[in-house]
């Protein structure tokens, strides 16, 4: 399957900054919120283009939005797609400002 080229900043929306993703950065894994229609090949190409690192593995997951109670009834948070990207040994991505 050939990936349709999208601009890198349309594929990678933002990094996930949390304690869990910070701990995973010690293992060379970084978590990003990505476009819902992005595939693993597009995510790999975008990370390599933006951060100039070698990506060895990409895992993706779809997080369903939670139902939220509002004043007028129920609503729902937006669903999002995340990618956990593993970079080559010895390479890092500075998304935590270290």
UniProtKB/Swiss-Prot annotation:
Gene3D superfamilies reported for this sequence: 3.30.70.330
Assigned keywords, A-Z: Ribonucleoprotein, Ribosomal protein, RNA-binding, rRNA-binding
Keyword Transferase belongs to the record: no
Example GO biological process: translation
Top-level lineage group: Bacteria
PANTHER family on file: 60S RIBOSOMAL PROTEIN L23A
UniProt record similarity statement: Belongs to the universal ribosomal protein uL23 family.
Subunit record text: Part of the 50S ribosomal subunit. Contacts protein L29, and trigger factor when it is bound to the ribosome.
Its biological purpose: One of the early assembly proteins it binds 23S rRNA. One of the proteins that surrounds the polypeptide exit tunnel on the outside of the ribosome. Forms the main docking site for trigger factor binding to the ribosome.
Protein name: Large ribosomal subunit protein uL23
Organism from which the protein derives: Bifidobacterium longum (strain NCC 2705)
Upper classification of the organism: Bacteria, Bacillati, Actinomycetota, Actinomycetes, Bifidobacteriales
Name of the gene encoding the protein in the UniProt record: rplW
């Amino acid at each position: 399957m050939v990936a349709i080229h999208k601009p890198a900043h349309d594929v990678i929306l933002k990094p996930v900054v949390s304690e869990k993703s910070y701990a995973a950065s010690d293992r060379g894994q970084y978590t990003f919120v990505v476009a819902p229609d992005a595939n693993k090949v597009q995510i790999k190409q975008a990370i390599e283009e933006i951060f100039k690192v070698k990506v060895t593995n990409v895992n993706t997951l779809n997080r369903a939005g939670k139902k939220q109670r509002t004043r007028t009834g129920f609503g729902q948070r937006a669903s999002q797609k995340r990618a956990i990207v593993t970079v080559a040994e010895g390479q890092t991505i500075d998304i935590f400002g270290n």
